Amino acid sequence: MSTSFENKATNRGIITFTISQDEIKPALDQAFNKVKKDLNVPGFRKGHMPRTVFNQKFGEEALYENALNLVLPKAYEAAVAELGLDVVAQPKIDVVSMEKGQDWKLTAEVVTKPEVKLGDYKDLSVEVDASKEVSDEEVDAKVERERNNLAELTVKDGEAAQGDTVVIDFVGSVDGVEFDGGKGDNFSLELGSGQFIPGFEEQLVGSKAGQTVDVNVTFPEDYQAEDLAGKDAKFVTTIHEVKTKEVPALDDELAKDIDEEVETLDELKAKYRKELESAKEIAFDDAVEGAAIELAVANAEIVELPEEMVHDEVHRAMNEFMGNMQRQGISPEMYFQLTGTTEEDLHKQYQADADKRVKTNLVIEAIAAAEGFEATDEEIEKEITDLASEYNMEADQVRGLLSADMLKHDIAMKKAVDVITSSATVK
């Protein structure tokens, strides 16, 4: 193989490479064995035409396209490796010459990874909007949330108040015409929960069981049902019951009902304090890591970020997100219908952060390279074991999904992140 690289612009160039006859001949044999199965030529059983007859009838050139598809990926990868290029997008391949008995000559228009000029990434001083401290109020708030979860609804006489639950029938109409989805029977609605459109729940405060209330509202301009967006509507609402929350007493019995591992309210609060401290510690460390990485990226200079890298990142993120949705049984069509969004909206959402994500990855990779980080066999095995445990998979399944190169890359990236964050201090 002969190879050359011609630089055309920053991070862009053309590879010229050849594919030798030693590679072409077996590829032509494979291509012939593939196509002959479907050949039905008079004088020969289907799939049994000799190669010489095929060449006479169709010409060896008829196999070139299939043969090229077989040999091209390996040849292109070998050319990139020989030239020591770091290619970051799909190449544009063109055939220069494919003459019988001669090496094939091709070109590949490629985009290469941009140069990263690192700035300071160690001993960084960062500011974070996070704290490890847990206040008594935060502990009490957690207890109160659990206490409210054990509250029981009891029917009450008198007017409905904010926080009460009303059991209602309702029929909605616009200009006197009922609309789809605007009707409900025996619906339990907590006043103040924000379940219904703005203004609806407030108009039921002060109502009593047995009353019928005309609730007049205006649908928001951005309402997902476009035929209703911005329109005035009336909901004829009948109140069947008004229920209020009866919360249990704040005592040791409540603590035992919430958590069978404790005996007193003080024990419950102590347990919650430890849980909150642990969660806050993780959140604080994450905040420091994020701030330190962001500063390291800001201190670096990336020479002309190729738009192809950003484009690929957008589609990678979108595909990952939609794949997660489908694993939960939600198709793309269902997701867009439920959220009132479009594929274009999702694309814009990921586009906004793609540039930042690509730059961050490039800088972390550059730090890993500058530090000479590599992964040992022991580290790779530990990573496989950890991933298998995290995703409830067998180790061999992980090995089948992730190549050794991917695992080595991830481990080196983690080491680079650790270098940035372990030396960072908080202002």
Swiss-Prot record:
<keyword id="KW-0143">Chaperone</keyword>
<dbReference type="InterPro" id="IPR037041">
    <property type="entry name" value="Trigger_fac_C_sf"/>
</dbReference>
<dbReference type="InterPro" id="IPR008881">
    <property type="entry name" value="Trigger_fac_ribosome-bd_bac"/>
</dbReference>
<keyword id="KW-0131">Cell cycle</keyword>
<comment type="function">
    <text>Involved in protein export. Acts as a chaperone by maintaining the newly synthesized protein in an open conformation. Functions as a peptidyl-prolyl cis-trans isomerase.</text>
</comment>
<dbReference type="GO" id="GO:0003755">
    <property type="term" value="F:peptidyl-prolyl cis-trans isomerase activity"/>
</dbReference>
<dbReference type="GO" id="GO:0051083">
    <property type="term" value="P:'de novo' cotranslational protein folding"/>
</dbReference>
<dbReference type="Pfam" id="PF00254">
    <property type="entry name" value="FKBP_C"/>
</dbReference>
<dbReference type="GO" id="GO:0043022">
    <property type="term" value="F:ribosome binding"/>
</dbReference>
<keyword id="KW-0963">Cytoplasm</keyword>
<dbReference type="Pfam" id="PF05698">
    <property type="entry name" value="Trigger_C"/>
</dbReference>
<dbReference type="GO" id="GO:0044183">
    <property type="term" value="F:protein folding chaperone"/>
</dbReference>
<comment type="similarity">
    <text>Belongs to the FKBP-type PPIase family. Tig subfamily.</text>
</comment>
<dbReference type="InterPro" id="IPR036611">
    <property type="entry name" value="Trigger_fac_ribosome-bd_sf"/>
</dbReference>
<keyword id="KW-0413">Isomerase</keyword>
<dbReference type="InterPro" id="IPR008880">
    <property type="entry name" value="Trigger_fac_C"/>
</dbReference>
<dbReference type="GO" id="GO:0051301">
    <property type="term" value="P:cell division"/>
</dbReference>
<dbReference type="InterPro" id="IPR027304">
    <property type="entry name" value="Trigger_fact/SurA_dom_sf"/>
</dbReference>
<keyword id="KW-0697">Rotamase</keyword>
<dbReference type="GO" id="GO:0061077">
    <property type="term" value="P:chaperone-mediated protein folding"/>
</dbReference>
<protein>
    <recommendedName>
        <fullName>Trigger factor</fullName>
        <ecNumber>5.2.1.8</ecNumber>
    </recommendedName>
</protein>
<dbReference type="GO" id="GO:0005737">
    <property type="term" value="C:cytoplasm"/>
</dbReference>
<dbReference type="InterPro" id="IPR005215">
    <property type="entry name" value="Trig_fac"/>
</dbReference>
<dbReference type="GO" id="GO:0043335">
    <property type="term" value="P:protein unfolding"/>
</dbReference>
<dbReference type="GO" id="GO:0015031">
    <property type="term" value="P:protein transport"/>
</dbReference>
<dbReference type="Pfam" id="PF05697">
    <property type="entry name" value="Trigger_N"/>
</dbReference>
<keyword id="KW-0132">Cell division</keyword>
<dbReference type="InterPro" id="IPR046357">
    <property type="entry name" value="PPIase_dom_sf"/>
</dbReference>
<dbReference type="InterPro" id="IPR001179">
    <property type="entry name" value="PPIase_FKBP_dom"/>
</dbReference>
<feature type="domain" description="PPIase FKBP-type">
    <location>
        <begin position="163"/>
        <end position="248"/>
    </location>
</feature>
